[in-house]
Regions:
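Active-site entrance/lid segments in N-terminal catalytic domains of soluble metabolic enzymes
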Residues: 1-161, 165
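Glycine-rich phosphate-binding active-site loops on the catalytic face of alpha/beta enzymes
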Residues: 21-22, 37-48, 135-147, 172-207
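Conserved acidic functional residues
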Residues: 116, 170-171
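Conserved active-site-proximal phosphate/metal-binding subdomains
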Residues: 152-167, 173-315
Length: 315
């Protein structure tokens, strides 16, 4: 079995905080890292100046390893990678594009490379190219998603990847999920939605409240007709957007125009009616706003209890 992500990154617990555009900043990342996980700063929609400033800020807030998430569909991705190489966070996660061309530059800077993969083919490709670990993300996740479920990925990717940790993502929000992934041979889990209701999370209070009120069936997937599916909470915007997609009367260009800026509208400005509240399916665990340290302690306690109970199972 491959190493755990705790060994690769030098962290206490096998939990990575997902990169969430307009949300995952230095404050949240540092809080997660200080609590024993691996925090991530998101570059989604951000300038190079912002990325540099947040990395430096995180270094002042924690002496523990943290990372940066780069969406490879961003127009300024090359400049952002250059900044990351200069500022040297512990690791980088790379998604929404081909990560392999960036491996050499990042590794030469001493930065661990962790691509996000949606299928077995890409998982094998990035492993062969020298990834230090990978995140296999199922469609239960919030934000941009693939077409395979987390269980389908877990049972097919993990047996193929022998030498590096496979961190599972998509629908994980508690210790039972973490325990299940570890029993399946995962090197850890990545959670994004779970940290949206953390005290240290900068997402607008209106969105936090909607997440706490949400039930398990309250997500919807937009963008299926555009080749870029995005999961979020059902509201006026997301339901009307999907309706327009299904009717087939609205052009692709118009749909893209409608969607542009809606993530920021919800997460930063707090418009939970007309904005896209990106979140995954692990919603019922979002009961209240509490510190990151409490969230992680509760996850680990439940994971240990679940693993202990699993030891008594007879087949």
């Amino acid at each position: 079995m491959a190493k755990s992500i705790t060994e690769v990154l030098g962290i206490k617990y096998p939990i990575i905080q997902g990169g969430m555009a307009w949300i995952s900043d230095a404050k949240l990342a540092a809080a997660v890292s200080n609590a024993g996980g691996a925090g991530i700063i998101s570059c989604g929609g951000r300038t190079t100046e912002y990325v540099r400033e947040e990395i430096r800020k995180a270094k002042q807030l924690t002496d523990k390893p943290f990372g940066v998430n780069v969406m490879l569909m961003a127009p300024n991705k090359d400049e952002i990678v250059d900044v990351i190489c200069e500022e040297k966070p512990a690791f980088v996660t790379l998604g929404a594009g081909n990560p392999v061309p960036y491996f050499a530059k990042l590794k030469e800077a001493g930065i661990k490379v962790i691509p996000v993969v949606p299928n077995v083919k890409l998982a094998k490709r990035v492993a062969a190219a020298g990834a230090d670990a990978m995140v296999a993300e199922g469609m239960e996740a919030g934000g941009h998603i693939g077409v395979l479920t987390t269980m389908a990925l877990m049972t097919q990717v993990i047996p193929e990847i022998k030498d590096i940790p496979v961190v599972m993502a998509g629908g994980f929000g508690d210790g039972r999920g973490l325990a299940a992934a570890m029993l399946m041979g995962a090197g850890g889990v990545q959670m994004g939605t779970r940290f949206l209701v953390a005290e240290e999370c900068s997402v607008h209070e209106n969105m936090k409240q909607k997440l706490i009120e949400a039930v398990d069936t309250d997500t919807i997937v937009t963008g299926l007709t555009l080749g870029g599916a995005v999961r979020g909470i059902k509201n006026k915007f997301s339901t009307e957007f999907v309706q327009k997609e299904n009717e087939g009367k609205t052009s692709k260009e118009e749909l893209i125009r409608m969607a542009t800026g809606t993530n920021k509208l919800a997460a930063v400005e707090g418009d939970v009616v007309n904005g896209m509240m990106q979140a995954g399916q692990s919603l019922t665990v979002l009961q209240k706003v509490e510190p990151v340290a409490t969230i992680i302690e509760d996850i680990m306690k439940q994971a240990r209890e679940t693993l202990s109970a699993a030891a008594t199972i007879k087949l």
